[in-house]
Regions:
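Cysteine-nucleophile amide-bond enzymes
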Residues: 34-35, 62, 66, 119-122, ...
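Mid-length scaffold segments of soluble, non-membrane domains
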Residues: 17-52, 56-62
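Sparse, context-dependent recognition of short Cys/His-centered cofactor- or disulfide-binding micro-motifs
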Residues: 14, 30, 53, 68, ...
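Secondary-structure boundary elements
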Residues: 1-18
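Hydrophobic/aromatic-rich core segments of domains that either
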Residues: 45-92
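A recognition module on extended beta-rich or small alphabeta surfaces enriched in W/G with H and D/E
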Residues: 75-127
Length: 127
């Protein structure tokens, strides 16, 4: 549903350019993570917790990348599963967090605070 809503027709980085120039409505990695998190939370799963994470948050060269992670209720993010529909242009990639072959994930709040983007942390805490 999100791939249709985002009008995905290209690989992720090309789609990002189109979102950033206004020719596509949404579809940046953080859009996918935010919308996926909202949909999963709306399901009200009592046995799962949602986490948000960012990779490459310290890199000046690589783009940072956001995702949603699910874990057993009460478990740490690192024990969860990465749910990343951005990576393959709308096809869901999933992997245990610690086995992700491409990204090393950190809790979103930690990365945002460290990088001085506190307003995003506060907005996430309110919503």
């Amino acid at each position: 549903e999100l791939a249709i809503a985002y009008q995905i027709t290209d690989p992720p980085l090309i789609h990002n350019v189109k979102v950033n120039n206004g020719s596509k409505p949404r579809g940046l990695c953080w859009h996918w993570a935010e919308d996926l998190e909202k949909r999963l939370l709306a399901e009200g799963f009592a046995t799962l917790d949602m986490h948000r994470a960012i990779a490459n948050g310290n890199s000046r060269i690589l783009l940072d990348h956001s995702t949603a992670i699910i874990s057993a209720a009460g478990a740490q993010m690192e024990a969860g599963l990465v749910l990343d529909p951005w990576r393959q242009g709308g096809e869901l990639f999933w992997s245990p967090v610690m086995s992700d072959p491409r990204y090393d994930w950190e809790p979103r709040e930690e990365v945002l605070r460290r990088n001085g983007r506190v307003r995003y942390v506060q907005a996430g805490m309110e919503g």
